[in-house]
Amino acid sequence: MTDPVPPRIAIVVSQFNPEVTDGLLKGALDHLAAQGAPVAAPDIIAAPGAYELPLIAQTLARTGRYAGVVCLGCVIKGETAHFEFISLGASLGLMAAGLQTETPVSFGVLTTYTDEQAVARSRDDAENKGREAANACLSTVQTLRRIRENALA
């Protein structure tokens, strides 16, 4: 990261499927710290599940304290249509939160067909999707800063 002042980033993490979301959180925290934007414990917010992520993310973004919000969760397909409703609601809600607040809200919600797929995407390696969501958030923060600075020039 090349910004002189590191951006303050919040992380919202679903408490459902913690064996997966804990790995996503570790990936996001490790990446943000490595990029010079460590996240303090008070800036890590628990959400009951993926469906609650959008409201919490939007509320955090509206405080004006955060340059971006990383959202992490895991929805694994079961035997009913619940998977589709939760996945779509979380996806559209997080996109709307970012658009309405003009604050980067990244989508680090796994939507997998099996437990094995979820575990593979939350391992402590370069393919960790929490890491990717944190990277997307930081990259978007930097892009928006450049756009806003150029608009003022």
UniProtKB/Swiss-Prot annotation:
Enzyme class: transferase
Keywords, ordered alphabetically: Riboflavin biosynthesis, Transferase
GO biological process, one term: riboflavin biosynthetic process
GO CC, alphabetical: cytosol; riboflavin synthase complex
Domain of life the protein comes from: Bacteria
Known catalytic reactions: (2S)-2-hydroxy-3-oxobutyl phosphate + 5-amino-6-(D-ribitylamino)uracil = 6,7-dimethyl-8-(1-D-ribityl)lumazine + phosphate + 2 H2O + H(+)
UniProt name for this protein: 6,7-dimethyl-8-ribityllumazine synthase 1
Species per Swiss-Prot/TrEMBL record: Caulobacter vibrioides (strain ATCC 19089 / CIP 103742 / CB 15) (Caulobacter crescentus)
